[in-house]
Amino acid sequence: MDDDAIEIPITDTLDLHPFRPAEVRDVAREYLLEAHARGFTQVRLIHGRGIGVQREGIRALLSSLEIVIDFHDADASGGGWGSTVVLLAEPKE
């Protein structure tokens, strides 16, 4: 087991701010796969506003995952363009 492994609670929101930029895509991928396996059909990834590097990396990841049906900016109360709402496919039984 990796000594650096961090257990992330699986809720409908993942804040990516605590993670190093090099970890963000892997963390998001693992989170999305686990959220999907647990039956979540909508989640929110908080990547921040900044200059958009993390946002674009997250969106490239989302485009590559078969479990992702769609994604879009959150509404203003959910973080606006600093967060991405992700619609996930129903898990297969």
Give names to the regions the model predicted.
Residues M1-E93:
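Long, charged, low-complexity intrinsically disordered regions
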